[in-house]
Amino acid sequence: MRYLTAGESHGPSLTAIIEGIPAGLKLSAKDINEDLKRRQGGYGRGNRMKIETDQVIISSGVRHGKTLGSPITLTVTNKDHSKWLDIMSVEDIEERLKQKRRIKHPRPGHADLVGGIKYRFDDLRNALERSSARETTMRVAIGAIAKRILKEIGIEIANHIVVFGGKEITVPDKLTVQQIKVLSSQSQVAIVNPSFEQEIKDYIDSVKKAGDTIGGVIETIVGGVPVGLGSYVHWDRKLDAKIAQAVVSINAFKGVEFGLGFKSGFLKGSQVMDSISWTKDQGYIRQSNNLGGFEGGMTNGEPIIVRGVMKPIPTLYKPLMSVDIDTHEPYRATVERSDPTALPAAGVVMEAVVATVLVTEVLEKFSSDNMYELKEAVKLYRNYVNHF
């Protein structure tokens, strides 16, 4: 499975083309729109989310509610584009119109300045538009399709916030993936402990009032994953490495860990490794899951536990100092529409990219033209593992 996305933040639309989805997967626009709505939710989102009510258009690869095995084309219209017709015009326009929303005061922490230097732009909006997190709309849409496939083969996925700014959320022990999904969806800040809800909302309000932003840590959990996805044979076939790349590719993500992650660097081996046991009903199991479901770059049958850290959104309503690229004089950075935090939305994106990587790996191991063959292949493999 592979995909390509295209589109600018204030352009006419966002587009994705996906290749490699097996035929026979039940799929409708509603399945995708549900996740697009989740991405637009969450406490602390800004005015852009009030303008855009994302709805996907499926224009190829699906007929009568089922995939055809051919490339799938997805499009999401940017409703806000109607206010940007001149600024985002494909055709050349008058110089005075170009100057209306020209960006020449790059924002620290964004792609503005480096992108402008790399591609020789005199208007940094050219970098801003594509580097915007608006692009993640399409990765969520793609992830929604991936999650449909995972569900068909008994794999479920969920996410929740474990750190909001500097506030760590206490997570109840031994929650299932389904329980995490339900609790997180019931929270406006995507947490699983309701006792922290109001505290986090108040914190977001105070940060917004101060013209500042906050980041945090998001945890994604995947259950029902077969043993042996990924490989130890080559560096670029390790599945945890692929997931790490996908997570850090999300806008504003600066780090990733699995299981105990960086904490394992402070412990002894006897405190970190997961003891192995065997039962007639379950086969091989681990007595703990400190390694987050991976050994040797391969899934070991335990739930995948991966966390990503998101830096605070760089656009500040009380902007930091920058430089005017025309005069090189000090100047306050440009202010674009932004949010005090986008952690709940980022969790939906993280869930989507992890699901997409997993489906790509599943389809590589269990190469199938249609969903019937895929489900049979996975079923046969699970039976083999249970009797190993």
From Swiss-Prot:
FMN binds at R130, S131, S132, N251, A252, G296, K311, P312, I313, P314, T315, R337. Its cofactor is FMNH2. It comes from the Bacteria. Homotetramer. Coiled coil: none annotated. Pathway: Metabolic intermediate biosynthesis; chorismate biosynthesis; chorismate from D-erythrose 4-phosphate and phosphoenolpyruvate: step 7/7. Its EC number is 4.2.3.5. NCBIfam families: aroC, PRK05382.1. One of its GO terms (cellular component) is cytosol. It holds the Pfam family Chorismate_synt. GO terms for molecular function: chorismate synthase activity; FMN binding. Transmembrane segments: none annotated. Reduced FMN (FMNH(2)). This is Chorismate synthase. CDD domains: Chorismate_synthase. It comes from Streptococcus agalactiae serotype III (strain NEM316). This reaction introduces a second double bond into the aromatic ring system. PANTHER family: CHORISMATE SYNTHASE (PTHR21085:SF0). HAMAP family: Chorismate_synth. Keywords: Amino-acid biosynthesis, Aromatic amino acid biosynthesis, FAD, Flavoprotein, FMN, Lyase, NADP. SUPFAM superfamilies: Chorismate synthase, AroC. GO terms for biological process: amino acid biosynthetic process; aromatic amino acid family biosynthetic process; chorismate biosynthetic process. It catalyses: 5-O-(1-carboxyvinyl)-3-phosphoshikimate = chorismate + phosphate.
